[in-house]
Amino acid sequence: MKPILGLVILLSGTVAAQAQATRVYSDAGNIVIERGGNSTKLTTSEMDLDPVLSPNGAFAVYTRQGRGRSPRTYEFNQTCPTEPRPDQLRRINVDGSGDQLLLTGRKGEPERQLCDFRSKQFSADGRRLYFLTPAWASSGALHVYDLRAGEEHFLMPAKGLLVLSFCPNKYKDHLVVLSRRNFLLGGSYDWYWLYDPTGKKELGPLGQFNNAEDMIRQARGFWCAEKP
């Protein structure tokens, strides 16, 4: 899932800036919060990765890898492991309290299996959390978790994701999804497509970009530049 890495790094920095210079990160498998130049360890399992800070800066959501301290690399077509333990999606308050389990990884069909919980991104109000999981040979699966209802469901195949939570215009919380499509007479191509926040309505193609960073610059400089 290497195409996602640059996008995750950029978005982590964006969320941190919005939350008054507060940022969360993983260090030696533990979740750490940094505020005002001071760092505090929130977890101590040595198995925790890929945290993302909520829009209001009150809590973080992270992955606890079920394979413990061993190095973890997921490919798109990987079957989600449940031994020795399944991965977990967890939430913890920024003061270290309230560490709780949100989702447990599971095996299943590509659109149903859960693990990794990569490229986590919130909606603007912090209610919905979008993430990617391994699924098919050429694509991951996009899921959404409703933090109020405690419900998760599959949205669509996806190789990359950007939630336009920072948009001040009509595209606020819309989804930019990198999808693989097939040409009519053979072959395939990877383009970005725009969806409504539910992921149920495709609004149209956004085109091809050399990398995720170029796509994000386009989103901030053009798609989300106009005010309501």
PLM features: residue spans?
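N-terminal, post-signal-peptide region of Sec/Tat-exported proteins
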Residues: 37-72
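A short loop-to-beta-strand structural motif that recurs across blades of beta-propeller domains
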Residues: 30-32, 88-90, 141-143, 191-193
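Short, conserved, GDST-rich strand-edge loop motifs in beta-rich repeat architectures
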Residues: 23, 65-85, 134, 179-187
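Blade-terminus and WD-like Trp-Asp/Gly-His loop motifs, strongest in beta-propeller folds
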Residues: 18, 51-60, 120-128, 165-174, ...
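An edge-strand/N-cap motif at the start of beta-rich repeat modules
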Residues: 18-40
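Sec-dependent N-terminal signal peptides
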Residues: 4-13
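Residue position within the beta-strands of beta-propeller blades
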Residues: 25-26, 59-63, 129-132, 175-179
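Multi-bladed beta-propeller domains
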Residues: 34-47, 91-116, 145-164, 196-219
